[in-house]
Each structure stands twice: as C-alpha cells, then as structure tokens.
C-alpha cells in the first residue's frame, strides 16, 4: 500500500494519526510518481539523442497527465479541512486537499497552468491555517515541500517550516536533544523506543533546499551529473 508514511499525528501522545483528513490517497501518490517516472524516461531518452523513444515517452506522459487531472483535480467542489469553514467557489485542489496531495502535482508539473496559483494557495492555506504554520506531510510530501513552496513564491512559508522549534518540526527534535532525524515527529513522547533514531528520509528536501534556494546552487536538469551548474 503506497501512502505518505510518518505523517505527524494530531497529538503528541499518538504514534500514528487517527484523523483521516491528514492522510493522502495512495492512488494519487502512486499515479503522480508514475508520471514522474515517465518524465524521467522522456528526459533520459532526449539526453541520449533517442528521438523516437523520447517522443513515445512524451506522448504517454501527456495522456497520463490528462487522466491524472480528470481523476484527482477538484474544481469548485469539496469542503475545507478547517472546521466550520466553507471553501470559496473558486477553490481548486487535488485529492482531499492535504499539503502532499497539492504539492506533488505542483512539483511534478501536472497542474494545468491556469490553476497553479489556486492549487499553491490551497497548499499554503493548509499549512498556515489548518496546521498553524507547521509540517503536516509524511516522508513522501516532505521530499518536495520546501523547494516547491519557494518556487511558487512562498519562500517565507518554507523558511517558517525550516526554522520552527515547536511540534511538529525538525527544530522540535533538536530542542528535545535529537542529533539525528527521528522516525516519529514526536518520538520523545509517542514512542521513545521507536525503531529508528536516524530516519534520514524524514529530513525531506531540507538540505537540497539549503543548497538550491538559500545558497543558489543548482544543476542544469538537461545536463548529466553536475557538468553545468
């Protein structure tokens, strides 16, 4: 079962969240990553000069992208995760409007151009309003979170998440004495004997964000390795 594991639970005492609104549809995640693989295959074929292969991968990518949006993109429908709050009629989001559900399509270039602003706005609203300025993604969503927020003009929100010291955050772990990344965002209270005290995947894109966005060091995606910075 594909899912966004290690989503921070709503309580410091819980090991796993019991709130279904925090969990992202596994089918959305799996399909988004299938599309990411198609994009990579298209790029690899192009880099090697395999024109026919590149065109074949690109055609499949475009057809899958249309199917993805037909299935998971919601326009002017649904309800807000904020209790008592009704969505504005122009609200546009993916899946059940979790941060991960919106960040993945944004990061993978799956959102139709005229909807990008609204989808990004919903991701930011979920972070600031629903989650009070804290991380709510698991190991999958967090891999793209900070860089995509910055790319969409919300570097201030990315910085807030990167520097928070209250639960759930990386800073919370540090404040509680962690020298490596815990398996659980609340590993000190939920399960101090958790399986992993060095769960590097939960670091997400914090380090790439520091290199790419804070330091401004980026590799050319159309050149192999780091041949062109």
Where are these regions (language model features)?
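Active-site core of glycosidic bond-cleaving carbohydrate-active enzymes
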Residues: 3-229
